[in-house]
Amino acid sequence: MNNSSMKSFLSKYHLQLFFFAVALESLAANFAHPITPTLIQNLQLPDYSFGMLYAGMAFTNFLFSPFWAKQVTRMGSNRVLGICCVGYGIGQLLFAIMKTLPTIMLARLLSGFFVGGIMVSFLTYIIHTSTMENRGRYLALSATFTTVFAAFGYLIGGFAGVVSIPLTFALQSGVLILCGMLFAICLREDREVTGRSVSIWKEANPFQAFLDARRFMTLTFAVLFFAVFLTSTATTAYDQNFNYFIKDQFHFNSSYNGMLKAVVGFISLIANTTICVWIMKRTNVKKSVIYVLGGAGVTLIAITMLEDILPFILINIIFFALNAIYIPLLQDLCASASSAEHSSMVMGFYNAMKSLGMIAGALFAGFINAAGPRLSFLYAGIFFLVSMLAAIWYYRRSGRNRENA
């Protein structure tokens, strides 16, 4: 295949190659998750280390997401993904090598810095290279691939960790670096062509990147981002408590964890490729998201009242489906509300609010669990209901704006 044929092939199949690389990255990103508790125990680190390291990675993800959104505009999603996947791979190698809590925290902070760029670029590439008609479907597909292959990555990491923890980290880093090469080579150019010469280091101040959000921020956007923050907080608090709860309350052994991850992945696949796509094509997303968020809140509150295993699992399955659906719906709302000029910054801010919710949810679950094992579910349900109220306000505000236009 000559150079011209290769370029033609990459141009024609860039989205298929993008989703293949997304699946591979989501797979590799989760190899280390099931072995992290074992690594912490082997190093005799304090019990709070797991939550602290998770929050550390989420913190730099949050802090630098708007920064990476600006770099997407300058360099293009393909280059940012290439840089960030390689950087993430190096961060995970350092995670495996370090032996003390402070040095491991530095490795996690480094990984979080690059993960922010990956998450932002996933969204910006879809927005920049798809039509308005296909954007919602592709966002749902991206969310599906991320969730489903994360579950399989968790399973693979668990099995590989039994053989060797260093081998698992080496495998993870190798696949992440491979993903970086695929993204850099196979994706279409989507950077903004400008005559300005801008230094990346001059823009490296993450707080300036947040201040630059004033270019697009309105009260309507602020309420939408508040809903993103609340839902991310709720989902993270739920996730952090769920595995501990089923082991503590129902005495499930550790083998059920991988099985449940696989079930979650399968449910997400079905929900996103059927219900979510139907909502985006056939309904008003601004209105439909209200019912999805409300349903998620009600199911979580119902979970706190269930004592038997079977009803508990069934209601959780309903929540898994709703939890899978709301993410691409909120992504689509943020993308639809942004102009072409500010789309990268908007999605960067979206990822920042999602990451901030991850930090808040992890810390909240850690503290509230001591007061009661079901309280994380209860408050996560309340957070979803409050986000539903924010979605109602957003829907009504949008309706008034159309009438006044």
Model-derived segments and their meaning:
Residues 2-12, 190-224:
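Juxtamembrane intracellular "pre-TM" segments in multi-pass secondary transporters
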Residues 9-58, 223, 232-249, 257-260:
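Helix-loop boundary and gating motifs at the non-cytosolic
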Residues 58-66, 150-151, 265-273, 358-359:
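Residue-level signature of mid-helix packing/kink "hotspots" within the transmembrane helices
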Residues 64-76, 161, 271-284, 369:
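Helix-to-loop junctions at the C-terminal end of transmembrane segments
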Residues 79-94, 287-302:
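Structural signature of the two symmetry-related core transmembrane helices
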Residues 91, 102-110, 310-318:
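Paired small-residue
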Residues 107-148:
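Cytoplasmic helix-loop-helix junction between adjacent transmembrane helices
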Residues 340-371:
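A late C-terminal transmembrane helix in Major Facilitator Superfamily
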